[in-house]
């Protein structure tokens, strides 16, 4: 017998779920546009060679597709690598773009925590040379605006610099070749105990002493005072670390000007497991919520160059919003079941022609409206439908109303009833005093 269940890590969405997803996406999109970004679209699947060796240990999570006519393809893992491919293939050196679309990962799903195998990401990126940390600060500002907009609660934007992290690993004595795999383990700090982290690092070749030294650095926390601690540490003698610390100081300064430094935290343990990051990295989360980070991103200056021999380097910085995770935090309180503003009902008969005439007037005025389709529908059942869908108004067509060229307008919330001429119906419904 054919199974009717959805594949593991995927889900159907009810109208209520779709309405919330659409609202979240539209609100995020408006913020992207506010910051001057333009939209692009890229294919859901890419050439496998484009995606290979860009995600570190997460490469194993890529969904491969069956060979089609000699092209080895895979479903996109994120929207960042396709954007880099878009820049390189179109020889674009400067762009501020957003893209909202589905991505695919062979991860262990947890629907309650918003972790799926198919999910929507909303990306914002700035490509091109810029004044020191200016684009990075604008990215943080955009993240801050999105997090505050949803009113979910207190949030934290954690930042670090990949160069600081690799400098620490150099001081610890980790080989350059192991930076990526060690960072992938460090990236699990909030999901695993330090004992488990240590065991995994030992399996990757670190000694017990190296693990202890790594832990000392990774447990530095706080705000800009962490940068002061780094300046007093031997790691500051490494030039790339020195440059990164200066960049972080400038980031905090610019974020103060932009009014988004209040939730900004310097976190040395922030690693971001993806291989393509080169500078500032960030993650954002709502404090005390169980879904983990809802936004992640950073600077990736070499990704376009690494796509092929003839590709040039285009500095980029940006972030992805995990729409499903924000959805999981908002859904319980969300109750929208319909976009309909007016339900056209009938009392004492079918009155099909009259209902359709009223429906046309309402829809010509851009008022979302609907009516019933069955041959029989009691007015009581119509009212139950309106209550279930939380439709604000019922416009009732009946024998007496037809004779008078009128309709009865019922406010479904207040139960206020009013007889209104058909030609005045639209203005009555749109009058704020009648809402």
UniProtKB/Swiss-Prot annotation:
Its main location: cytoplasm. It is an enzyme of class 6 (ligase). Pfam families: HGTP_anticodon, tRNA-synt_His. Its EC number is 6.1.1.21. GO terms for molecular function: ATP binding; histidine-tRNA ligase activity; RNA binding. Keywords: Aminoacyl-tRNA synthetase, ATP-binding, Cytoplasm, Ligase, Nucleotide-binding, Protein biosynthesis. The keyword Nucleotide-binding applies. Gene3D superfamilies: Anticodon-binding domain, Bira Bifunctional Protein, Domain 2. GO terms for biological process: histidyl-tRNA aminoacylation; mitochondrial translation. It comes from the Eukaryota. It catalyses: tRNA(His) + L-histidine + ATP = L-histidyl-tRNA(His) + AMP + diphosphate + H(+). It is found in: Cytoplasm. Belongs to the class-II aminoacyl-tRNA synthetase family. This is Probable histidine--tRNA ligase, cytoplasmic. It comes from Encephalitozoon cuniculi (strain GB-M1) (Microsporidian parasite).
